[in-house]
Amino acid sequence: MKLLVVGGGGREHAIIKSLKKNPNVTEIFALPGNGGIAADAVCVPIGATEIDKIVAFAQEQKIDYAVVAPDDPLVLGCVDALEASKIPCFGPRARAAIIEGSKVFSKNLMKKYGIPTAQYEVFDDMAAALAYLDTAPIPTVIKADGLALGKGVIIAQTRDEAKAAVRDMMENHVFGKSGDHVVIEEFLTGPEVSVLAFTDGKVVKPMVSSMDHKRAGDGDTGLNTGGMGTVAPNPYYTPAIAQRCMEEIFLPTVAAMNSEDRTFQGCLYFGLMLTPDGPKVIEYNCRFGDPETQVVLPLLESDLLTVMQATTNGTLADTEVRFSDKYACCVITASAGYPVSYQKGYEITMTPEAAAHTYVAGAKLEGGKLLTSGGRVTGTTAVADSLADAIQEAYRLASGVQFENAYRRSDIGQRALQA
C-alpha cells in the first residue's frame, strides 16, 4: 500500500513511524515532511494547505490511503477534496472540522446539547466586549474564534490584561480574521487532561489519556507554547472519570455533530478540565494533538492503519483498539528563546539510541546535515513499566539530542508524579 501523510511536524513523524509497522505498507509520502521525517518517508515539498497540489500528487502516485494530520488543511477541506478524487483518507471533512476551526461554533454546540463547558459570552463588537470586561469575574479567559496556531487563548489575571487581549485580537488583528469574533469565558480550575479518541461518527474509542505541559518554563512559568512535553496515562483520569466523560461528553459530542449534519470521522481531541463540578470541555481539536501523539501512539498495541481505515469505513465498532498498560513520557527539545524569537540553522546531532526514540519537528536537511528550522525541534519518547522510569529514561535519551542553544524543561511529568 502507498500512503500519504499531510503535515510536517513531530506529530506526523510519530504517525508515520506507527504506520510503518504495518507489513502491507510499501511506501509513505510526507507532504511536506521535514528533515527528520525524511529518514522514514519520502518528503515532497508541497505545503499542507496546497490542497489542489496535494490531490494532484495523490492521483499521480495512485495513493491507496491518505492521513491529513494538521488543523489548517482539515478546516480548509483537504479530506473533502481527496475523497472527491476517490482517495480514501483519515480525518474529518470541513463541515466537521469546524469543531476546532471555530470556537464560537463549538461553544454554541455544547450549550445547545448540554455538554459541560465553561460559561461564556461571544462578541463581534470590540466596544461591547470591553464593556462586558468592566464587570466580568477575573481571572477570565479570552479566546480568538478561529485557528491561531494554538496561541489564540489568553488567561487574563487582571481587567487590563483582558482588555489588552481583546484589543490585540479585534483591533490589532494579531490573529488576522481568527480574532474578528472572540469568546470570553469563565476561568475553570482543576487538573487538565487530554484525551484523543478515534470515532467513525457512531462509536468512540478513546486512546490512552495524557498530560501536556504548555508553559515554556519549569514550574509551569513563562509563555504558552505548543507543548514542551507530555506523559501518558494521566493519573488524574481515573476509570470513574473516564466513564463519566464517555457518557456526558464523548458520545454526546459525536451525537450532536450528527444532529447538525456534521458527522465527525477521524481523531477527535478532547481538552478537559476536571473541575470540582465534574469534567468540562476546555477545547475540541479535530486532529491528533502535538505532542500528545508522541506518547499515545508508542503505547498503541493495535495496528494504527487498521484502526484508521475502520474509522473511515464506519466499522470501528468491530475493530479492537488496544493500548499497553505501560507509561510513556515525551520531552521536547526546543530552540532557546521559543516561543518568542530564536536562532535557526544549527546542526543537530543525535546518538543512534536517541534517534530511534525521537520524533523530529523543526528541522531541515541541508548538505546532508540536519539543521534546526523551528522552535520545537525534537520530541524524545520513552516507554517504561512506571511513570518515574519513563520520565527518567526520556530525559536520558533526550540528552543524546544536541544542538547549539538547545533548551528543555527539566520537570516534565513531575506534576503527574505528585498526583
Residue ranges of model-derived segments:
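ATP-binding N-terminal substructure of ATP-dependent carboxylate-amine bond-forming enzymes
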Residues: 1-94
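Solvent-exposed alpha-helices and their adjacent loops that cap or buttress functional pockets
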Residues: 21, 36-37, 90, 112-114, ...
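Short acidic-hydrophobic, aromatic-tinged amphipathic segments that line or gate anion-handling sites
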Residues: 43-49, 121-125, 156
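A conserved helix-loop-beta module that forms one wall/lid of the active-site cleft
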Residues: 90-152
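Internal nucleotide-binding/catalytic subdomain
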Residues: 152-291
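Active-site "cap" helix and flanking loop/linker of ATP-utilizing ligase/carboxylase catalytic domains
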Residues: 246-268, 285-353
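Peripheral (often C-terminal) accessory segments that flank ATP-dependent C-N-forming ligase machineries
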Residues: 310-419
